[in-house]
Each structure stands twice: as structure tokens, then as C-alpha cells.
Amino acid sequence: MKRFCLWFAVFSLLLVLLPGKAFGAVDFPNTSTNGLLGFAGNAKNEKGISKASTTGGKNGQIVYIQSVNDLKTHLGGSTPKILVLQNDISASSKTTVTIGSNKTLVGSYAKKTLKNIYLTTSSASGNVIFQNLTFEHSPQINGNNDIQLYLDSGINYWIDHVTFSGHSYSASGSDLDKLLYVGKSADYITISNSKFANHKYGLILGYPDDSQHQYDGYPHMTIANNYFENLYVRGPGLMRYGYFHVKNNYSNNFNQAITIATKAKIYSEYNYFGKGSEKGGILDDKGTGYFKDTGSYPSLNKQTSPLTSWNPGSNYSYRVQTPQYTKDFVTKYAGSQSTTLVFGY
């Protein structure tokens, strides 16, 4: 009896002394790097030199994020951490948080939204996983550099099961904001199983200036198993300079889907293009990149850029599914989830 009383007293003291979030765990997809594919994984560059896979905060401390201040405190630095959203995080105006390195930022099954939170890199950023998150922003935050996930430095980023929900827009309106930017020296990125929706401009990939040839070759990027819905232009994206493997994606309700611009090397395969393809808007080809498509539906035409000689099979192994399978899969499983994550391959 005395032993039991002593144990109970110690346990009660621990409840008082330990921080509440030690006992505030929430269910989240603690899947580590399961499902990782493409350039963010084990890959080679065009010279055959291998680089390590993205690991994020693997084996690091699990920290439950309850506020913007928590996010700012723990997303920076280089210590490996798995940061789990315990609450939806919201700000009344644009709030910028700088990304460090060796982090996994993951939404719980119940709480996964970042509203008006804008994540950006620095020279110390890299090896980061973003998973099971929903990005939302107010429509009035619509300037040219108002981009909720802005990656321009560092290597090894995996964006997986993330929803960029956008907002209503007018095609003739003045919105200039985008959903995602990857450019400058950011490199070795995979976007997978994610959903981009309801925005005038979608993704801008590669340095956004046709005269900055020092960025030729950046980024190496895999865009696979994603759902682009109601993006007026740039879904999958406007691409410059880098190597872009665009496979098994579904784009629907668009005016223009793939924009081929300065020195982009694009290998497209087995994508499904829905409403909008009948207007001939699948390819917006500036004639200044390199492009090849195989197996997409419907067949792509209006290509003016020369064929690319690059094939992503020289960088990593992968497999493809049919366009119809892709459409069915991503409409069911792409974006943030409230239950188990299902990965495309």
C-alpha cells in the first residue's frame, strides 16, 4: 500500500511539473519518409552523381504546435524535429515564418490549417518535409510576392498531401499572388499527392526572369500524383531553367496548364487534362524550353519548343499509371486528409 501511495504521489507530481503538451498528443500521419519518390528521394543529377534522400525531422523530437509563436520557435534552426499542428494556426494579416533545416511539418488529422501563414526559406534552409497541411489565405493578400510556400534556397524538400485551397477569383481581376514558388537555388524537390485549387495563378517554378541564366539547371523537380482544380493558369505550372518530371497529374477547369519558358527541361507523361483541354490550353509554349510528353490524355499539341533529350529515368527509378487511373486516384486521395494517407507511385 505504501509503495502504491508513493507511486501515485510521484505520478501526480509529474502531471504538475511536465508541460501540458507532453500529454496533449494528437493523431497525425507519422509515416516518416514512406511514399517519398522522385528528386527529393535518392536521386542522381545529370552527371550521374548521387545525393542523399530527404529525411526531414526523422528520429527527432516530436513537438506539438499550438500557436504562431510555437511555429516560429521550432521551425527555425537545424535540430531535427517533427512539428505536429495541434491547432489550426491563423493570423489576421500576412505573417511570415522562416524555415530552418531538418524539419517535418505535419498537420494532425483533426487540425491541419495554416491561414495567412507564409513560409519562406533562407540560406540555412533545407531537408524539410511538408505533409498533411492546408494552406489558406485571405483574398486581399494578393500581391506579386504573396506566396504561402516560397522556396528559393536549400536542397531536399518534399511537399506531400498538402492542400492549397485558394479562393474565388476573376480571370480579369488584378490578383498577382501565386500558390507556390520554387526557384533561384532551391533544388531537389518533390510535390506529390497534393491539391492546388481555386486561384488565378498556380505554381511558378524556376527563377522568374528570362535573363538570369546563372540559374539554368535549377530546380530538379518531380511533380507526381497531384490534382490541379480551377487554376486559371499555371497548374502544373510556369516552368523555367530546371529539370521537371511531370507525371500522373490531373488538371481540370483551366485556361492554361503547362507553360514552357526559358531553358525548362520538361518530361511529361501519363497526365490527364480535363475541362479546358478542348480550348487548346494544355500547352502554353513560349518556344524557349525543351519538352516531351508521352501517354497523356488527350494528346498534347501546339508544341513549338524542341524535344528534350533528358529522361528522368537517368536520375531515379519510378513507375507510371494510366491517365484514367491517375484522375480517379488523385480526386480521391490528393491533398490533406483526416484519415490515413494513401500514396501514389
Swiss-Prot record:
It catalyses: Eliminative cleavage of (1->4)-alpha-D-galacturonan methyl ester to give oligosaccharides with 4-deoxy-6-O-methyl-alpha-D-galact-4-enuronosyl groups at their non-reducing ends. It is found in: Secreted. Inhibited by Hg(2+) and Mn(2+). Not affected by EDTA in vitro. InterPro entries: Pec_lyase (IPR002022), Pectin_lyas_fold (IPR012334), Pectin_lyase_fold/virulence (IPR011050), PEL (IPR045032). Induction: Up-regulated under high-phosphate conditions. Optimum pH is 8.0. Retains 70% of activity after 16 hours incubation in the pH range 4-11, at 37 degrees Celsius. Belongs to the polysaccharide lyase 1 family. This is Pectin lyase. The lineage of its organism: Bacteria, Bacillati, Bacillota, Bacilli, Bacillales. The gene is pelB.
